[in-house]
């Protein structure tokens, strides 16, 4: 294409094709969705003058292909080997670890300073944890779909990745969620650890790429913020409702929705330890960092945050920011003399991987079980039943957090009264 070679402007190269050329169904939709029969395959081979041997590639073709690959890439390979030879021992070791996919990730000490007022948003904690990981783990690279200031998914003190600076840790993907997910899969195939980020309501734009992440078992970290109806006046377009249920249904994919700073740290520890496809779902509102939440228990999927003081009468399961609301409900019910247990379930898929003994210990059968989550009820029927879920099965509303919560009945007073009524039935 001499014209393309002589121009630095965008070029469209159009190549005319005929679907199913040489087949009896040439030029029709039949050849698109149906396999060719043996007779058709035979006559195609006769037309092309090729041997009638199944799956045969001649040595001549193989040799030509190998020569072509070497002609195109030989210089690049030689240049790469020369650059590797010039590396110091530390860099050579890191390169070997990258190629062998054996670089250890140490998250014993997270560089997170707990705020004086004891409150922080999980998206803010996530940003600090990502940067803490980046200090000790050179293979972390990622970015967002033009919303890093909102999702906090950005590595500080490093340049943006570009042609001129390929060592940059941040990638400016632009508002291109689908491409972002696909690029992350490619990066993961090189044994780097990519993270990508956008608002949770926009996760549907990259669902195809994310599904392939799970199919290929790639350790891509999906970071989604603005996780519920409490994100403000942007309204239903920015308020995810059905997304959590959909994510929890994806095979070979772990979805984490941490309640506070402790669980956010625990989510990242689990993600990096397991090296599996995963998403972390984050809130934008500051929430209390609970004394009894445990980062070490997140990998189990669910654990007891508050145990019943007297005989167990009811269990409340919750996730994300709703733990703060649930704790208020718990306090009131305990004061009234009810035996209530609070279970935080940051990851449903991780909980389902635990032993039957552990699951029975956390959620014993025969106990009235309630759910509090600002999301669809669809993923919760395994643990409870209709009428015991404080969830949302409609689109959200535009308004501030308190007004929207009130409109959907998400206040401690409303929920506490309904749970008390159910306990007495």
Kindly give the residue locations of the regions a language model identified.
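Detector for methionine-enriched segments
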Residues: 65, 152, 180, 216, ...
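Residues at structural and domain junctions
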Residues: 27-30, 62, 66, 112, ...
């Amino acid at each position: 294409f001499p014209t393309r070679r002589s121009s630095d402007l965008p070029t469209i190269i159009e190549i005319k094709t005929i679907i199913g050329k040489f087949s009896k169904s040439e030029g029709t939709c039949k050849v698109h969705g149906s396999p060719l029969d043996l007779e058709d395959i035979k006559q195609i081979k006769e037309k092309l003058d090729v041997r009638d041997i199944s799956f045969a590639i001649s040595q001549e073709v193989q040799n030509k292909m190998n020569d072509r690959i070497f002609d195109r890439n030989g210089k690049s390979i030689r240049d790469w080997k020369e650059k590797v030879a010039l590396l110091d021992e530390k860099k050579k070791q890191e390169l070997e670890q990258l190629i062998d996919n054996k670089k250890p990730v140490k998250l014993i000490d997270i560089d997170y300073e707990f705020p004086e007022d004891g409150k922080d948003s999980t998206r803010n904690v996530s940003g600090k944890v990502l940067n803490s990981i980046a200090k000790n783990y050179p293979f972390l690279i990622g970015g967002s779909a033009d919303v890093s200031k909102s999702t906090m998914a950005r590595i500080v003190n490093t340049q943006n990745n570009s042609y001129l600076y390929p060592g940059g840790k941040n990638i400016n993907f632009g508002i291109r969620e689908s491409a972002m997910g696909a690029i992350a899969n490619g990066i993961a195939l090189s044994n780097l650890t990519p993270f990508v980020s956008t608002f949770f309501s926009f996760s549907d734009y990259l669902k195809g790429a994310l599904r392939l992440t799970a199919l290929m078992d790639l350790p891509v970290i999906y970071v989604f913020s603005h996780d519920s109806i409490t994100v403000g006046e942007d309204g239903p377009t920015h308020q995810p409702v059905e997304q959590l249920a959909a994510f929890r249904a994806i095979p070979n994919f772990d979805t984490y929705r941490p309640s506070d700073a402790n669980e956010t740290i625990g989510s990242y520890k689990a993600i990096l330890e397991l090296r599996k496809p995963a998403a972390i779902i984050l809130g934008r509102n500051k929430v209390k960092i609970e004394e009894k939440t445990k980062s070490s228990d997140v990998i189990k999927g669910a654990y007891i945050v508050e145990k019943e003081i007297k005989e167990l009468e009811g269990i409340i399961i919750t996730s994300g920011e709703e733990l703060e609301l649930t704790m208020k409900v718990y306090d009131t019910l305990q004061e009234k003399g009810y035996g209530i247990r609070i279970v935080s379930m940051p990851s449903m898929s991780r909980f389902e991987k635990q032993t039957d003994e552990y699951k029975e210990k956390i959620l014993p059968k025969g106990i009235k079980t309630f759910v509090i989550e600002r999301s669809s009820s669809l993923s919760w029927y395994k643990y409870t039943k209709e009428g015991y879920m404080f969830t949302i099965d409609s689109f959200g509303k535009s308004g501030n957090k308190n007004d929207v919560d009130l409109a959907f009945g998400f206040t401690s007073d409303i929920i506490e009264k309904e749970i008390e009524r159910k306990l007495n039935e």
